[in-house]
Amino acid sequence: MADRDRAGQYYQQQRGQVGETVKGILPEKAPSASQALTVATLFPLGGLLLVLSGLALAASVVGLAVATPVFLIFSPVLVPAALLIGLAVAGFLTSGALGLGGLSSLTFLANTARQAFQRTPDYVEQARRRMAEAAAHAGHKTAQAGHAIQGRADQAGTGAGAGGGAGTKTSS
């Protein structure tokens, strides 16, 4: 009896965990009316297309079964014709694919170049701003150096004038 109760508790616990997992997967709100209408419209359409593809497959199999004797009788003519048509189709498809690849690569290069030229004024403006800042900084440093030299010259001139008058001998 205790085993049955324990098994029941285990089952309830597992069921609760599964329920929480499912709740985590499912969306919290119901689909909107437009989503429901879309599903209601596309589901039958998808089924119809699936049925039509099955019918096309069945018709192809029946047609192949009926046409096989004709293919065997006319095979000396049909095989070279089929090879010729197959090679022509392969050539056209290859040409189109290579042309599309070339066109897309040229488009990519043109877009890359266009983006590079659009960014160039930003780089030029940034370089111009840095040059102006460097010139202003150099001018400021030059002015400071000029003032320092002027101050030293004034000190030397004042010190030399006062010291020169006291240190020189006059003969009279």
Curated annotation (Swiss-Prot):
UniProt-annotated stretches for the region Disordered: 147-172
Membrane protein topology class: Multi-pass membrane protein
Membrane-spanning intervals of the chain: 42-62, 70-90, 91-111
Stretches for region Hydrophobic: 39-110
GO cellular component, one term: monolayer-surrounded lipid storage body
Key word Ribonucleoprotein present: no
Annotated signal sequence range: none
Matching PROSITE patterns: OLEOSINS (PS00811)
Subcellular compartments: Lipid droplet; Membrane
Function: May have a structural role to stabilize the lipid body during desiccation of the seed by preventing coalescence of the oil. Probably interacts with both lipid and phospholipid moieties of lipid bodies. May also provide recognition signals for specific lipase anchorage in lipolysis during seedling growth.
UniProt xrefs under PANTHER family: OLEOSIN, OLEOSIN 20.3 KDA
Protein name, per record: Oleosin 18 kDa
The species this protein was found in: Oryza sativa subsp. indica
Gene: OLE18
